């Protein structure tokens, strides 16, 4: 049994009123189990405490509001009258008294005594009460990084004021109630929304703060014992477990040694500054923010009654101390925030679930106060290593809402831009879909770290974006200038842009230098300690970890010192090319750093494991974030900072590209910058291969890596609703995420929906499918209506491009196109792909391609062979993994045509003729068939299926299919074994019971297929080879109705000629085919849609052309799909469509009428105006198609499906009516006008199919129609 000496005695000494718990600790396993039970208990109790604290805060606030006993000025209300001087004294002098709401004491949740009634038991109770924070901030800001006197600490605890029930329609209800202010303990108010206040206000503030200190001294009296200590940045001064963590013993407290590392060798620690004032006392911070014309936001008071209605209560978050102290602790679930908000979109999840207003709240104000240097800061320093160790320490958010706080790296002296300056407005946020120069590669982990550590969030620089607006600043009439003046103005703008690009580079350099400084800061004391008897690291380890960092710092310091004065003394002829050329010539130092990077990281990890003191130091390196604020620093890990140079060098060419873009070729810098770019590109090409694998992995544990294998957008079926998801397959788990809605300027963010370790994942079998819900299918009519809208919008876009109209119209159309394509992508898939977790949960995806489903299943099964152990992720680990997806993803856009680049091939439009010849390589006799898929509208669709070739290892199908292409680029072929005994077959995912034997694909290259000759190819499928021939017919030729050269046949001969020759009202071929299909094809699945064997169709065509009397015998022996194909071919090859070229435009216009009565009258009159042979043949065929549709439950052919098949066949005009170009890969103009035409033809036929009855114009026609001859 394990000896637990001293536990009972220590327990009784600490808790004299309770007996020590009994613990049976017989082995290490017992200790571990007891520890887990203890942790679970802590998590449960902590959650209960937090919930009760949250409820207490709400009730206190509600009580304060109802009794109107709160400190109105502190809550953002204008003080109506100055209270008596003594009003503040009781509040300061009795902070430890228990709450007494009954007698009117202030119950607002800003009093330490109410929020922490157990404060007496803290070992740090010797500290004065005035040094503590208000309780309203305590639950949410336990990890406050700012000084304890920051008014923003109170402000950050309150959400933006929402519309109250008393004024639902208030216009002001959506505006943020608090502004971003900064206070100094001596000077009072120093900044409002990051703008320094005037000297007069500052002097008044200084006087006010002196008065406050005097009040505080009088009221505190002898309550101030010893001088208080300030809070550590990033730490709470009060521990949730009641322990004081600020011991000055260097051996017992590694954090103390780290924070005082430079003075560790005998230097005296500077004295703590006295804290003799009461925080948050008599300070007005309220008011509405109003946009000014290029000025800082103003403070506007509101009426007391209105403000009282809008008083809100604070949100809360969980204390971070539980994460650190309990080894896992309670963590908020990443899929459902614990912040109790009304919208899951208001907060990031998990680690980033900070108590802050919605990002959109401050968006409008942030954009107004943005300077070029601020906008450009995110250039080189934006990325981070895949798993920064600083993220492993789970911290609470900063009290100042970082979304609303834009702190400049460099003082510029002006606010950019103003209301009247629209140069960058709208552009900075509209270019986020593409990499904007050197400013858009920030990964999500880095952005969250900035929020947490105090480094301000800064949008991508408009000055560095390649998508900058060309509008003149303040010159709305610039479009009316003469061409010469306009070109001069453009040149002037380009040179002006050059300055802003350089300003962004300068800001980026400053941030990068601060990171290198943070790396060098611990290096000196570590080297000094290495010579002592108790070194933290050896000299060799220090040299390995910090290899080449001093040299890099010197190089960039010299570059910055040279660039800064030139930008400050700017002129359009200012030269900077020599500086960039010299910087590029020194990239060899980066080569040495990159080569050593892996060794440095490995050494640092080993040192962290071996030395807790160094581990603490390595996770708390301070980098200066704002040179204008003396103590403004951010906390970074050693891993983060060591990755900065690696990330920096991989982006070096982006800066030069942007600079060259705005440097005229006549400028002296142009050639120098080109030379620098050439050097940088050559250098990068040599190291990219080494860096890419590192960026594609994410650290899981020490020495282990989680690799991304595959990712894709899919549709998930959630409680009957379709949801678009992004699925990531890692080496050990399957992760399902949701792409969060992006407000303007925000980078991509993902929410985790669920994950399954691969060891726990399985595919469901047939006996488990009985309880699965049916897949809701979207009617084909709706899908076709969406396609019509998409084609129409694409045509409108092309028209706008040709007209060169304003970008607003184009953006609106592109947004509408994206919405419609996304909806089509969401609604079209119908093939189930189900995954099952060992815990009993199942998830269903809908896929349009069996090829893609098979790929996912193969990838998962292959990886499962390498996974042997189940695991679970904490919500923080899960959040880190989700954040990494932004950088690791390989599929960056939803597969929409709107996301295609302009130079990307639009695909083929026309008809692909494919002959599936044969297959070899099967090991045993099987019943085999093939299916063909092509891509259309961004997803793959099954287009054709061969007949089943029975009991063979070498099937010879030799079947020809005609497949319509709509922007298609790939042809896929899948080979199956037909399984007739379904009971013996493991039926997975609700798919057909047939077994997939192999799959392959071939690219449809317009250059190869444009000569319209047969192209023979062999597709390899892991040992199985399928022989295939393809031929492409472009729209130009497929639209032609070629008349037959001999008028004795029936194909290609006018219908009137055929009926006259046969002395019938309906052609013999039509009657024969319809009769045979109605005899044995009415229950054939996909009749008229499934292609028949091309050789059979050609044989029937020849027989009808020569009037073979045995044709009826031939038809009885042929596949019914070949007979259906023959009938379609006859109508397709008519020299003039059944609806005639003359009436076709009228039918197209009639179907577009909105009034149903007018439409019916128009369409019937047009129909009855057709030539007699055409009308009677159409009515005969129409009656047959309606009978086919009556068997829809069996043959799956609805009226809409039949209209899709026959519409273009019966209505497509002849060549002379077609004005479409010949290029098969012609962009959207031709393809979409054709698509619209096809959709219109389908709608015309569908209209007649849906009409209950079509009256004949006279009795003569009616008698003819129903004559026995027909």
Curated annotation (Swiss-Prot):
Record PTM text: Autophosphorylated. Phosphorylated by FES/FPS on tyrosine residues, leading to down-regulation of the BCR kinase activity. Phosphorylation by HCK is important for interaction with GRB2.
Sites of Phosphotyrosine modification: 247, 553, 643
Any one Gene Ontology molecular-function term assigned to this protein's record: protein serine/threonine kinase activity
Site feature: Arginine finger: 1089
Modified-residue entries (Phosphoserine), positions: 216, 237, 358, 379, 384, 461, 465, 475, 487, 1263
Any single Pfam family the record assigns to this protein: Bcr-Abl_Oligo
Coiled coil stretches, renumbered: 28-55
Tissue: Expressed in brain, including the cortex, hippocampus, cerebellum, and brainstem, as well as the spinal cord (at protein level).
Keyword NADP: no
Record flagged with keyword Transmembrane: no
Gene3D superfamilies xref list: Bcr-Abl oncoprotein oligomerisation domain, C2 domain, Dbl homology (DH) domain, Pleckstrin-homology domain (PH domain)/Phosphotyrosine-binding domain (PTB), Rho GTPase activation protein
GO biological process: actin cytoskeleton organization; brain development; cell migration; cellular response to lipopolysaccharide; definitive hemopoiesis; establishment of localization in cell; focal adhesion assembly; homeostasis of number of cells
Record PTM Phosphothreonine, positions in chain: 387, 640, 692
Domain PH: 707-865
Cellular localisation: Postsynaptic density; Cell projection, Dendritic spine; Cell projection, Axon; Synapse
Residues annotated as domain Rho-GAP: 1053-1247
Quaternary structure annotation from Swiss-Prot or TrEMBL: Homotetramer. Interacts with PDZK1. May interact with CCPG1. Interacts with HCK, FES/FPS, ABL1, PIK3R1 and GRB2. Interacts with SH2D5. Interacts with DLG4.
PANTHER family: BREAKPOINT CLUSTER REGION PROTEIN, BREAKPOINT CLUSTER REGION PROTEIN BCR
Protein name stated in the entry: Breakpoint cluster region protein
Lineage, highest ranks first: Eukaryota, Metazoa, Chordata, Craniata, Vertebrata
